[in-house]
Amino acid sequence: EGAAVEPARAVRALADLGHTRLLTEGGPRLLGGMVAADVLDELCLTVAPMLTAGDAQRIAGGPSVTLPNRFTLTSMLEEDGFLFTRYRRT
């Protein structure tokens, strides 16, 4: 495994370089780290019309958070049963 990323530190470093928007794509560990670091402002989530079973993690895995982050649905598109959603932090 590679070195761990500290989300809050990475966001600050990129902001110091003048970056005002970030797009992160990854798995449950990266998303969980972003949530725990309290640096997630927006979430784009795709829901597929398929079900499977197994022991996979939740959408976000990692450190616990004291209070859940609240988001508001800002847009939703449907195509062939797939839902493309966008949420913004409230």
Which sequence ranges carry the predicted segments?
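Enzymes that bind and transform nitrogen-containing heteroaromatic metabolites
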Residues: 1-90
